[in-house]
């Protein structure tokens, strides 16, 4: 086997600010900066980190009104790609000189409510 490039991975073990895309994005940017300062070359967040994925969103709740409100909040806090959320994440990755992998709920700009579980990869160039 040949030589392989080594890397330092920051596995982000932090919760987002559920149903608050803006606050979660700011938190992600802080965590990206911290990972870069600690020498990581890749920061990896979990699936649907933005805006989080509370288990009750799609039916675990016994209260239908709460379930519908949670689903509406979930949709409202999803992000279009590209958009302001990805712009902020790209700037943070570039400033920290770190690759970023983050799971996010992507809202389809051409539909009324379609979302995708997207894994976004941002290079250290932003």
Show the residue positions of the predicted features:
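Eukaryotic N-terminal low-complexity, Ser/Thr- and Lys/Arg-rich leader segments
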Residues: 1-3
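N-terminal phosphate-binding loop and adjacent alpha-helix
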Residues: 13-30
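Cys-nucleophile CN-hydrolase/nitrilase-fold catalytic domain and related Cys-dependent amidase chemistry
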Residues: 21, 30-124
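Active-site-proximal beta-strand elements of phosphoester/diester hydrolases
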Residues: 6-16, 118
